[in-house]
């Protein structure tokens, strides 16, 4: 992956947000004593900070060159696994309780990994990262199902949207010229629509002062989806999805804080 000036700037912003949230987490009363979940989130933030530090420094020193596999790849995978552990602690149901939804999520991640490899030709990073990311996405599916935050129609619409998104991305690879640009724009708009719907649901839940379980489920799902979006993006759309990702990091913090404080 290569870094542009705008991407480095967005990385600096996310780094600052992660540092801010980490400091606030460390100041929470009872952190590490009353809730193991806060600790998992804290560790995930630490890994995110190391990942962003590497990304920003490398981007500044080697602008426009492809980043080789390095320690930051391990940090990125650790972020996904630790966030998944956060959810699994609150929502301990096994994957087979929701086989259809989990299987669909696994297929989406598998298809995404294939596309990542086509774009980057980085087999090892993409496969290892995909395994960690897939575990997080499946954990989000279980959390959403447990809290019943989506109707049956919403699940079907989400499944259809994911199928269309993969089809559009394949179309981008197999076509050229205006047709390829059309597929690309449609894919970006579809990803943004998904983010908008999750964000709207999250804002609604926060306004209603819902319980921490629902807030964890929706904010972690938003982070996961927006991560998938910027993995499939470039240029200004990459920055857009990255900013949305930062918003969900802050929402995750509010949800975890509510859980730690027992609010």
Describe the role of every protein-language-model region:
Residues 2-5, 24-33:
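Short, hydrophobic transmembrane alpha-helix segments
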Residues 19-29, 74-123, 130-155, 195-206, ...:
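Internal transmembrane alpha-helix with an interfacial aromatic "cap," most often the third helix
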Residues 1, 59-67, 177-179:
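Membrane-interface interhelical loops and short amphipathic "cap" helices
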Residues 53-63, 87-95:
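Transmembrane alpha-helix boundary signature
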Residues 20-23, 141-142, 162-263:
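C-terminal transmembrane-bundle signature of multipass membrane proteins
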Residues 10-24, 36-61, 72-82, 101-117, ...:
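Hydrophobic alpha-helical transmembrane segments of multi-pass membrane proteins
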Residues 35-39, 67, 150-152:
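Residue-level recognition of alpha-helical structural elements
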Residues 6-17, 67-81, 124-137, 181-195, ...:
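Alpha-helical transmembrane segments of polytopic membrane proteins
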């Amino acid at each position: 992956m290569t870094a542009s000036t705008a991407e480095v700037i967005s990385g600096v912003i996310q780094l600052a947000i992660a540092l801010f949230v980490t400091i606030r987490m460390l100041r929470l009363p009872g952190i590490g004593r009353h809730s193991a979940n806060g600790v998992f989130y804290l560790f995930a933030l630490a890994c995110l900070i190391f990942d962003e530090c590497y990304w920003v420094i490398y981007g500044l020193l080697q602008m426009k060159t492809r980043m080789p596999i390095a320690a930051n790849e391990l940090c990125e995978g650790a972020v996904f696994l630790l966030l998944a552990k956060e959810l699994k602690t609150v929502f301990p149901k096994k994957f087979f309780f929701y086989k259809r939804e989990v299987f669909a999520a696994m297929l989406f991640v598998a298809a995404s990994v294939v596309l990542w490899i086509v774009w980057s030709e980085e087999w090892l990073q993409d496969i290892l990262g995909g395994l960690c990311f897939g575990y997080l996405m499946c954990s989000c599916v279980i959390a959403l199902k447990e809290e019943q935050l989506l109707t049956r129609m919403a699940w079907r619409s989400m499944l259809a949207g994911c199928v269309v998104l993969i089809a559009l991305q394949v179309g981008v690879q197999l076509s050229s010229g205006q047709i390829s640009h059309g597929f690309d724009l449609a894919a970006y708009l579809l990803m943004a629509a998904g983010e908008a719907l999750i964000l709207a649901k999250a804002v609604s839940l926060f306004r209603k002062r819902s319980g921490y379980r629902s807030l964890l489920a929706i904010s972690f799902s938003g982070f996961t989806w927006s991560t998938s979006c910027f993995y499939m993006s470039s240029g200004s759309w990459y920055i857009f999805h990255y900013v949305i990702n930062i918003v969900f990091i802050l929402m995750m913090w509010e949800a975890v804080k509510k859980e730690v404080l027992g609010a």
